[in-house]
Design a protein with these regions (language model features):
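Non-catalytic beta/alpha edge segments that cap or flank active sites
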Residues: 1-59
Length: 59
C-alpha cells in the first residue's frame, strides 16, 4: 500500500517550525507496511489545500 502525507499549516513553511509530525507518521506507516511515496507541505489557504489534495488523489 502507498500513502502520501499532506502537512497543513502556514507555520510549516517558515524556517522556525519543523514538521516533526510527518516524520512520526512516516515511521508509523512504515511499521504497518505502508510506503510513503510523497510528502507535501501546504499553507492554511483553503484553495491551496484543495489544490494539493486534488493533485494527491488524481492519477
Amino acid at each position: 500500500m502507498l500513502a502520501e502525507i499532506i502537512a497543513v499549516g502556514s507555520e510549516l513553511l517558515t524556517p522556525y517550525r519543523l514538521d516533526t509530525n510527518s516524520l512520526y507518521l512516516t515511521a508509523e506507516l512504515n511499521k504497518l507496511g505502508i510506503r510513503v511515496i510523497h510528502k507535501s507541505v501546504v499553507g492554511d489557504s483553503r484553495d491551496d489545500i484543495r489544490a494539493t489534495f486534488r493533485h494527491a488523489i488524481l492519477p
